[in-house]
Amino acid sequence: MSQQDLTSDMLTRIRNAVRNHSANVTCLNNKLNRGVAQVLTDEGFIEGFDVVDDGRQGRIDVHLRYGERGECVINSITRESKPARRIYMKVDELPRPLGGLGIVIVSTSSGVMSDRLCREKNVGGEVVATVA
């Protein structure tokens, strides 16, 4: 089956795994998905991820993070920029989800990074997703 938007598919799989209280979720591998997983790891929303080579495209195993009472750290994860409607923002236009408690994942010319890192490096780009 052909997937058109692998990043939307990855975010939907993570959202469904959070609802089912799954420990791990498997997603298809590409450069943007690896970047999104790295940002989620760096910001503490997931435990980590493993890139598995299966002889074809490969896959990413994402390990979700849960709190002491069993609640997932990710409350919401939303795809912002879509293939039919790309959203680009300058660094001063980037929103602060939940007053700074959430993050915006941005694809820049310097790689995929969070809105906090974009403000430090003073770069804007395509808004990929919002995580809270």
Features from the language model and the residues they span:
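Core subunits and conserved enzymes of cellular information-processing
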Residues: 1-132
